[in-house]
Amino acid sequence: MSQQVIIFDTTLRDGEQALQASLNVKEKLQIAFALERLGVDIMEVGFPISSPGDFESVHTIAQKIKNSLVCALARCIDNDIDVAAEALKVAKNFRIHIFLPTSNVHIQSKLKKNFDQIIDMTVHAIRYARKYTDDIEFSCEDAGRTNIDNLCRIVEIAIQSGASTINIPDTVGYTTPYQFGQIITSLYNRVPIIDKAIISVHCHDDLGMAVGNSISAIQAGARQIEGTINGIGERAGNTALEEIIMAIKVREDLLNVHTNVRCQEIYRASQVVSQLCNIPIPANKAIVGSNAFSHSAGIHQDGILKNRKNYEIMTPETIGLKDVKLNLTSRSGRAAVKHHMKTMGYQESDYDMDKLYDVFLELADKKGQVFDYDLEALAFINNQQEQSEFFRLKCFHVDSSSSEVAHASVKLYCGNNTYTHSSSGNGPIDAIYEALTHISKLSINLERYQLNAKGHGRNALGQVDIVVSYEGRNFHGVGLDTDVIKSSVKAMIHVLNNIWRAKQVIIQRKYIKKNNN
């Protein structure tokens, strides 16, 4: 009989560590809701002790998520565990995930301890965490390079101490599928009480073997897989959950396991993570890449026309990728727009219909026809804009025709006031950047500027993503328009508003702290 493999998503914890700019609470909630719709069993949503912002996001997500188990990370330190429990206590169900290094290189060079001390810390931390919940996961950090005798010993003691899930991470992506499978097999053969806990694996992709190692672990008996959407994460990333999920579905005949994930939500979740994290999906990415279901060779095309099974082991519809042909114009009503959003997998709670319809009409007047990719891009950008923006564009003008130096004039609403400034720069983007930073009086450095076409042809929308640094933190901004200069202006104003909101949060925290003392 087929057994369930638990899907543990750590996009919002391990995955977020790879981002140039941290996600805000609203963005994390959007990803959490996408994961809940996907049907992941567990979502690890942060490391609460690491910062007030992480605590706030864990607490907020724990309040909102109802159908997935919410988990937070903690070191084997009492205060870490206390803070994690405090952030999670509003959740319907929650798990505390604690970890300790178990390899000699980590124990000796990082912690300056011996293995017996690691054992003592493990026992204490698990027992301490069980004050808050019986759902405790213990991770043997760098298990892939841990002496197998030591690994078996600490796993047995962790289970005896009350851990309900034991995680075996290949922290640096060092092992091969055969080797990693042997590690899991050894645990099942040598730990007498192994059946009292669920064995989990968490594989990194440094050698490109994270998914292979995870599949090998399943074949050896692991029943929880940890990973991230699109495989994002530290260094080369983590196990790509969409690949694991579809490998289990397509090869259930071989693996004899299943997941409870709603596969038709895979593509939608992948797009949400890619857009919010500002990490493009490679065209040849398995499952969710734009070429994943493309066939260009003549022989392949002929075979597909005769029978899709000739060259497709799964269909795009399985992951929620539908061949939608939109023909929307400025004469299309709200019902038509809402229908096409539903066809693309959006729920009404994913977007503000009034705001979306306004920008749709604006775009339709410019382009004539609006296609599915246009509508999806509008919905994403529209959802990033807050109800109240401190900085708002009134108008701008750029002149770069007569010399190497470009000139820009920008008029900006700042709260209830209006300011205008003219600047010059090495190109129109630089000139606009100088004008906006002068008006905002924010000393920012542009770390990244990226332009992507959303659609096809000369009428394609241009999406600009920028990352700026301000007072030791990175902030992300995004803008969308058929005019790439205007997209750039919108992205810069978006990032200025993100910085302004972050400053307001800091002021509020200081005020609350002052009044609580």
UniProtKB/Swiss-Prot annotation:
<dbReference type="InterPro" id="IPR036230">
    <property type="entry name" value="LeuA_allosteric_dom_sf"/>
</dbReference>
<comment type="similarity">
    <text>Belongs to the alpha-IPM synthase/homocitrate synthase family. LeuA type 1 subfamily.</text>
</comment>
<keyword id="KW-0100">Branched-chain amino acid biosynthesis</keyword>
<dbReference type="InterPro" id="IPR005671">
    <property type="entry name" value="LeuA_bact_synth"/>
</dbReference>
<keyword id="KW-0808">Transferase</keyword>
<keyword id="KW-0464">Manganese</keyword>
<feature type="region of interest" description="Regulatory domain">
    <location>
        <begin position="392"/>
        <end position="517"/>
    </location>
</feature>
<dbReference type="Pfam" id="PF22617">
    <property type="entry name" value="HCS_D2"/>
</dbReference>
<dbReference type="GO" id="GO:0005829">
    <property type="term" value="C:cytosol"/>
</dbReference>
<dbReference type="InterPro" id="IPR013709">
    <property type="entry name" value="2-isopropylmalate_synth_dimer"/>
</dbReference>
<keyword id="KW-0028">Amino-acid biosynthesis</keyword>
<dbReference type="GO" id="GO:0003985">
    <property type="term" value="F:acetyl-CoA C-acetyltransferase activity"/>
</dbReference>
<dbReference type="InterPro" id="IPR002034">
    <property type="entry name" value="AIPM/Hcit_synth_CS"/>
</dbReference>
<keyword id="KW-0963">Cytoplasm</keyword>
<protein>
    <recommendedName>
        <fullName>2-isopropylmalate synthase</fullName>
        <ecNumber>2.3.3.13</ecNumber>
    </recommendedName>
</protein>
<dbReference type="InterPro" id="IPR054691">
    <property type="entry name" value="LeuA/HCS_post-cat"/>
</dbReference>
<dbReference type="InterPro" id="IPR000891">
    <property type="entry name" value="PYR_CT"/>
</dbReference>
<feature type="binding site">
    <location>
        <position position="238"/>
    </location>
    <ligand>
        <name>Mn(2+)</name>
    </ligand>
</feature>
<comment type="function">
    <text>Catalyzes the condensation of the acetyl group of acetyl-CoA with 3-methyl-2-oxobutanoate (2-ketoisovalerate) to form 3-carboxy-3-hydroxy-4-methylpentanoate (2-isopropylmalate).</text>
</comment>
<feature type="binding site">
    <location>
        <position position="204"/>
    </location>
    <ligand>
        <name>Mn(2+)</name>
    </ligand>
</feature>
<comment type="pathway">
    <text>Amino-acid biosynthesis; L-leucine biosynthesis; L-leucine from 3-methyl-2-oxobutanoate: step 1/4.</text>
</comment>
<feature type="binding site">
    <location>
        <position position="14"/>
    </location>
    <ligand>
        <name>Mn(2+)</name>
    </ligand>
</feature>
<dbReference type="InterPro" id="IPR050073">
    <property type="entry name" value="2-IPM_HCS-like"/>
</dbReference>
<dbReference type="GO" id="GO:0009098">
    <property type="term" value="P:L-leucine biosynthetic process"/>
</dbReference>
<feature type="binding site">
    <location>
        <position position="202"/>
    </location>
    <ligand>
        <name>Mn(2+)</name>
    </ligand>
</feature>
<comment type="subunit">
    <text>Homodimer.</text>
</comment>
<dbReference type="Pfam" id="PF00682">
    <property type="entry name" value="HMGL-like"/>
</dbReference>
<dbReference type="GO" id="GO:0003852">
    <property type="term" value="F:2-isopropylmalate synthase activity"/>
</dbReference>
<feature type="domain" description="Pyruvate carboxyltransferase">
    <location>
        <begin position="5"/>
        <end position="267"/>
    </location>
</feature>
<keyword id="KW-0432">Leucine biosynthesis</keyword>
<dbReference type="InterPro" id="IPR013785">
    <property type="entry name" value="Aldolase_TIM"/>
</dbReference>
<dbReference type="GO" id="GO:0030145">
    <property type="term" value="F:manganese ion binding"/>
</dbReference>
<keyword id="KW-0479">Metal-binding</keyword>
<dbReference type="Pfam" id="PF08502">
    <property type="entry name" value="LeuA_dimer"/>
</dbReference>
